[in-house]
């Protein structure tokens, strides 16, 4: 279906006065978890990718230019688009994504995805992500490592393995990716249904509702 889903993730139930939510960090103390949340936080992007959403992206509420780009891409995409937006909650969870928004830290804690380009981050763009077996690892460029050794982003890959791997990269072990994780073209469900309807009409005619009601096995009740 051609729908856009935007998840504003502030790690809390803000509108209902501060209960812990499915994305609250482990141990988060709230009105409904006074001794700390005991559920591991849900990874929204991993779920969207696992459900085969054809467009999956992440941005940050205060990065207006980047957020606008992501929303524009989602609006132009034909099919289901899922966007996670890191959002602060000033009242009940202030500073939820501080590491991703502060100028002093965000170059080390975020990795901006660009299609066809290597995964590079850092204040001086001196760090990158490469695969070690089946797992990603952080490496420093220039110490026996070149850009050619790094993992290159491919948002068009039909197989969602790369997008899923990227969605699992979280602080403090990895920079957290932002941007478009996946953008693939597939036939839309509603378009395919309409094709079947049109084909049936062409083969059998438009049909009459009264005839449909009276056809096949029927019963009189009462």
Task: Please report, for each region that a protein language model flagged, where it lies by residue.
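Thiamine diphosphate
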Residues: 1-14, 66-69
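Active-site-proximal loop->helix
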Residues: 15-27, 47
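Generic beta-sheet signal
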Residues: 3, 79-85, 178-180
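ATP/pyrophosphate-binding catalytic subdomain of soluble kinases
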Residues: 54-110
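Flexible, low-complexity linker and terminal segments
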Residues: 91-222
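Core alpha/beta catalytic barrel or barrel-like domain that forms the active/cofactor pocket
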Residues: 8-18, 41-42, 51
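Conserved thiamine diphosphate
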Residues: 28-74
């Amino acid at each position: 279906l051609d729908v856009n889903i935007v998840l504003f993730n502030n790690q809390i139930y803000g509108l209902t006065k501060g209960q812990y939510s499915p994305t609250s960090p482990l141990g988060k103390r709230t009105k409904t978890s006074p001794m700390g949340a005991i559920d591991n936080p849900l990874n929204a992007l991993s779920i969207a990718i696992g459900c085969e959403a054809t467009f999956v992206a992440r941005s940050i509420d205060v990065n207006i230019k980047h957020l606008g780009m992501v929303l524009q891409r989602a609006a132009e995409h034909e099919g289901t688009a899922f966007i996670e937006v890191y959002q602060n909650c000033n009242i009940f969870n202030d500073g939820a994504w501080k590491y991703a928004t502060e100028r002093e830290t965000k170059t080390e804690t975020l990795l901006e995805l660009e299609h066809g380009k290597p995964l590079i981050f850092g204040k001086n763009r001196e760090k990158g992500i490469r695969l070690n077996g089946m797992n990603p690892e952080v490496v420093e460029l220039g110490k026996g490592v070149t850009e050619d050794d790094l993992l290159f982003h491919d948002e068009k890959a039909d197989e969602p393995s790369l997008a899923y791997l990227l969605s699992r990269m979280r602080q403090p072990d990895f920079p957290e990716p932002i941007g478009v994780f996946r953008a693939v073209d597939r036939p839309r469900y509603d378009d395919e249904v309409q094709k079947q309807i049109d084909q049936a009409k062409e083969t059998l005619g438009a049909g009459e509702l009264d005839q449909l009601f009276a056809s096949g096995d029927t019963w009189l009740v009462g």
